[in-house]
């Protein structure tokens, strides 16, 4: 089965990284190229420097918590969340140039000050972030890597689940959306075998219906038109055992 994402959503990749393949995208327009050259560096941060004790300090004052969206595509969901939650800081991770250019245009037009961007490997970002520093991680319609020999490239792996558990604070959230049944089953299996996460669904509608206030992405609308139904999986970070909290420096 081919990768179902649109070619223009799976656009030109930034330098090499662990969980993303290279794809050639459309040539950037002049203003988009200017945004990549001028605005992106102002919104990015250097993983070569030590992480701040609190990620809220990456933003202007007034930020109460920080969320991460991994692979934001065209940025529809991330922009809507940033507009709806002005006191929340959002870190958007996206390796493809065209997706980055799209969200930069929206940030500029809407004068949003609560979004920071990272064009590198999400695994490196998770390793850099301090423990218990994120309120939520969103993974919306990720690349399913459908061929068996490519499953190791899927973002959801035991290692990434452990990395998210480390950076999410107690009762923090992980939200996963996909219309690819195999990847949904894969994700559910990985999260259910982790002691650090609890699946919140109590009835079928809890995973069959979008989250409250959820903004559908362009790819999500396309999938619906073509008759593919997405699953909306919601997990919470379980309370850490006392010895785990001690290792994290909380005791």
Curated annotation (Swiss-Prot):
List the catalytic residues.
143
Q: Disulfide bonds, which pairs?
A: none
* UniProt entry keywords in alphabetical sequence: Methyltransferase, S-adenosyl-L-methionine, Transferase, tRNA processing
Q: Does the keyword Protein transport apply?
A: no
Pfam families named in the record: Methyltransf_4
The chemistry this enzyme catalyses reads: guanosine(46) in tRNA + S-adenosyl-L-methionine = N(7)-methylguanosine(46) in tRNA + S-adenosyl-L-homocysteine
Do you know which Gene3D superfamilies this protein is assigned to? Vaccinia Virus protein VP39
An example GO CC term for this entry is: tRNA methyltransferase complex
- Identify the stretch annotated as signal peptide in this record: none
User: Its domain of life?
Assistant: Bacteria
Q: Give, as in the UniProt entry, the pathway in which the protein acts.
A: tRNA modification; N(7)-methylguanine-tRNA biosynthesis
Binding positions (S-adenosyl-L-methionine): 69, 94, 121, 143
Q: PROSITE patterns from the entry?
A: SAM_MT_TRMB
Q: Give the residues the record marks as binding substrate.
A: 147, 179
MF GO annotations: tRNA (guanine(46)-N7)-methyltransferase activity
Q: What is its EC number?
A: 2.1.1.33
InterPro entries (UniProt xref): SAM-dependent_MTases_sf, tRNA_(Gua-N-7)_MeTrfase_Trmb, tRNA_methyltr_TrmB_bact
Q: Record's family?
A: Belongs to the class I-like SAM-binding methyltransferase superfamily. TrmB family.
Function according to Swiss-Prot or TrEMBL: Catalyzes the formation of N(7)-methylguanine at position 46 (m7G46) in tRNA.
Question: What protein name applies here?
Answer: tRNA (guanine-N(7)-)-methyltransferase
């Amino acid at each position: 089965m081919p990768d179902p994402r649109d070619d223009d959503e799976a656009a030109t990749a930034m330098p090499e990284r662990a969980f993303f393949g290279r794809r050639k995208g459309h040539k950037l327009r002049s203003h988009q190229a200017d945004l990549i050259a001028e605005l992106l560096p102002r919104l990015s941060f250097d993983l070569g420097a030590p992480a701040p004790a609190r990620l809220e300090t990456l933003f202007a004052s007034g930020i109460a918590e920080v969320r991460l969206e991994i692979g934001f595509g065209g940025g529809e969901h991330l922009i809507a969340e940033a507009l709806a939650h002005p006191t929340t800081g959002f870190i958007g991770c996206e390796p493809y140039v065209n997706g980055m250019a799209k969200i930069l245009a929206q940030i500029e037009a809407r004068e949003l000050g609560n979004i920071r961007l990272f064009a590198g490997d999400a695994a490196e970002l998770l390793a850099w972030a301090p423990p218990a520093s994120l309120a939520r991680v969103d993974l919306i319609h990720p690349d399913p890597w459908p061929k068996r020999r490519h499953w190791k490239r899927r973002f959801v792996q035991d290692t990434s689940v452990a990395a998210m558990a480390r950076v999410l604070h107690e009762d923090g959230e992980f939200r996963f959306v996909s219309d690819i049944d195999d990847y949904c089953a894969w994700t559910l299996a990985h999260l259910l075998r982790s002691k650090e996460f609890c699946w919140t669904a109590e009835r079928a509608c809890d995973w069959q219906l979008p989250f409250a206030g959820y903004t559908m992405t362009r790819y999500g609308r396309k999938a619906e038109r073509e008759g593919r139904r997405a699953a909306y999986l919601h997990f919470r970070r379980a309370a850490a055992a006392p010895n785990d909290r001690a290792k994290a420096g909380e005791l």
